[in-house]
């Protein structure tokens, strides 16, 4: 991107998280996108309701809730969270007060969705218990993010799932079955073109990878943090933050 701009005078608009490398380059003008407002959320929900993926009265219930719940509006601070909340709302036992609380409910809510919706046709292929499936998904997120991997072929998805099952001591389960459930039941990993699978959003991968690290023993956490610190110190661009 920088080379195209400097060598050919091409003006380029890019999107990025704040604080990434491109934000600190010379001749870059940074603009910050405003957080979405209540009216934006309602407009998105109206559009989502056209898919008829949930019951007809769900939209009005959410509208009513948004009018009196500022905390909920602040939680749904990006289109992704609005979409996920709309899908998950009929199956939530309680309304989340923060993005972190919402993410903590996300996998289980979607994994159990077929049990709670009468006309939901997809059945889980794997018979491992839901808490174990959650652990495997967290391990998959950790292993892939550790390898700087955000997308998969079908074969590599099966391989990462197999490795994640081994990390969780669930070797008896078929990787193909649990991978199917991650894609077709939770939809947190999605098909994207021919033989390509991606996480619904990078934040899904990041949150569940953090959950995996949180579940490690104290000694394993020490080893992991030591490896991260060493990696930072060996990376010139990051050494100042070590």
Model-based region annotation:
Residues 84, 128, 132, 149-152, ...:
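Short secondary-structure boundary elements
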Residues 120, 127-141:
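Cullin-RING E3 adaptor/co-adaptor recruitment helices
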Residues 83-90, 142, 211-214:
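Short glycine/serine- and small hydrophobic-enriched flexible loop segments
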Residues 1-113, 134-136, 154, 162-182, ...:
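P-loop NTPase signaling cores
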Residues 95-110, 209-238:
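A eukaryote-biased feature capturing mid-to-C-terminal, repeat/solenoid-rich segments of large proteins
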Residues 85, 237-242:
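Amphipathic alpha-helical elements of HEAT/ARM-like alpha-solenoid repeat scaffolds that form extended
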Residues 124, 149, 158-222, 226:
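C-terminal leucine-rich, beta-strand-based interaction scaffolds used for sensing/assembly
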Residues 140-155:
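Polybasic, low-complexity association/targeting segments
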């Amino acid at each position: 991107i920088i080379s195209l701009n400097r060598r050919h005078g091409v003006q380029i608009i890019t999107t990025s998280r704040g604080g990434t490398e491109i934000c600190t380059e010379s001749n870059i003008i940074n603009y910050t996108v405003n957080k979405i407002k209540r009216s934006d959320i309602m407009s998105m929900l109206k559009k989502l309701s056209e898919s008829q993926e949930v019951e007809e009265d769900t939209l009005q219930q959410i509208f009513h809730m948004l009018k009196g719940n500022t905390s909920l509006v602040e939680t749904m601070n990006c289109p992704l969270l609005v979409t996920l909340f709309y899908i998950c709302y009929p199956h939530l036992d309680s309304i989340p007060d923060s993005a972190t609380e919402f993410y903590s409910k996300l996998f289980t809510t979607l994994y159990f969705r077929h049990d709670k919706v009468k006309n939901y046709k997809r059945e889980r292929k794997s018979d491992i218990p839901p808490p174990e499936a959650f652990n495997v998904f967290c391990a998959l997120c950790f292993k892939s993010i550790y390898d700087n991997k955000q997308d998969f072929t079908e074969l590599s998805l099966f391989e990462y799932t197999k490795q994640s099952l081994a990390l969780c001591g669930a070797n008896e389960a078929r990787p193909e079955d649990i991978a199917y459930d991650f894609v077709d039941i939770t939809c947190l990993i999605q098909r994207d073109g021919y033989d390509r699978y991606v996480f619904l959003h990078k934040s899904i991968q990041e949150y569940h990878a953090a959950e995996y690290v949180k579940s490690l023993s104290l000694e394993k956490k020490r080893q992991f943090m030591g490896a991260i610190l060493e990696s930072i110190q060996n990376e010139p661009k990051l050494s100042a933050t070590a």
